[in-house]
Amino acid sequence: MIRTVPVGLGERAYDVVIGPGLLDQAGERVAAVLGKRKRVAVVTDAHVGAHHGERLSAALQGAGITVDLITIAPGEESKSFEGLADLSDRLLALNLERGDQIVALGGGVVGDLAGFAAAIYKRGIDFVQVPTTLLAQVDSSVGGKTAIDTPRGKNLIGAFHQPRLVLADLDVLATLPARELACGYAEIIKYGLLGDFAFFEWLETNVQAVLDRDVDALVRAVGRSVEMKAEIVAEDEKEAGRRALLNLGHTFGHAIEAEMGFGEALKHGEAVGVGMAQAFRFSARLGLCPSQDAVRAQAAIKAAGLPTTLADVRPEPFSADALIAHCGQDKKAQGGKLTFVLARGIGDAFVAKDVDRAALKAFLVEEGAV
């Protein structure tokens, strides 16, 4: 069962193809969006490359495409200035030309880093996303956001650079650890929470089917998530308005990640899980959202085994002032004012500008920060 979701961006439109067996079809599908030279650099990490690198390379070579494989170290640490410089140097050493392409095979780190390298290499070359985590399939591979992290925060240096094609092969999820699968589910339920109550209700009763990797459930869950993101990106590519809704849970989540040092102790999807639960509780505390919706949202996130409170992340209390400072670094902030995606209810998120710092601090203290 293959589903294709178009991302409507005029001359830069592309398809997100979702379903099993897509790695084996990658040759013909990538060849269709490649230039005449038929050469690609596949960027992957050591873990993903060991599982899927040879299979993807064989499919590409079978379509007459020359393949150079670049392997980076796994983990968020690669998504840095040093990692970008190293990847750029390796691409230059290959003498990749503008008519060639980069193929990003991996999760969000690989996609973000390879996509940013594609955006700036020789002032920009095309690239293809082949996301291998559930989180990347429903979020970072779609929409053209590419970036690296800095010590001051996550994704603060980057570019908008749309892929030519996204191949979301559901078969690759078979090797994905349960923790990574739950992280992807956080981004899936985000779409229901921000704008589709019926989808949220479906997820409440089908969470286990998704986590058990049931193909029909995955096609529906990934398909609807991508469909919603594609619709929003087509309307607001560069986050001037509605696209900011996709950051539900991310302002709180990124602040927590920054305090935790962006390491393995707290994965991005887990941070988003806490952040979404906090966004709903904060909305309820401000009187914007019914308290029962905040309770229901938290229960649905928790059902996937995701953390929903600061205490779930670590026993030591967080500093409220430090979290607020990180929130001020958020890309949605304007004029030094705090901006959050909050909710009037499940399926009804909105962008709240100039959020009161005192109210935020009182909420964080209530949440267990000091």
Swiss-Prot record:
This is 3-dehydroquinate synthase. Pfam families: DHQ_synthase, DHQS_C. Keywords: Amino-acid biosynthesis, Aromatic amino acid biosynthesis, Cobalt, Cytoplasm, Lyase, Metal-binding, NAD, Nucleotide-binding, Zinc. One of its GO terms (cellular component) is cytoplasm. One of its GO terms (biological process) is amino acid biosynthetic process. NCBIfam families: aroB (TIGR01357). Belongs to the sugar phosphate cyclases superfamily. Dehydroquinate synthase family. NAD(+) binds at G108, V109, V110, G111, D112, T132, T133, K145, K154. One of its GO terms (molecular function) is nucleotide binding. It catalyses: 7-phospho-2-dehydro-3-deoxy-D-arabino-heptonate = 3-dehydroquinate + phosphate. It comes from Caulobacter vibrioides (strain NA1000 / CB15N) (Caulobacter crescentus). Binds 1 divalent metal cation per subunit. Can use either Co(2+) or Zn(2+). Zn(2+) binds at E187, H250, H268. Its cofactor is Co(2+); Zn(2+); NAD(+). It is an enzyme of class 4 (lyase). HAMAP family: DHQ_synthase. It is found in: Cytoplasm. Its EC number is 4.2.3.4.
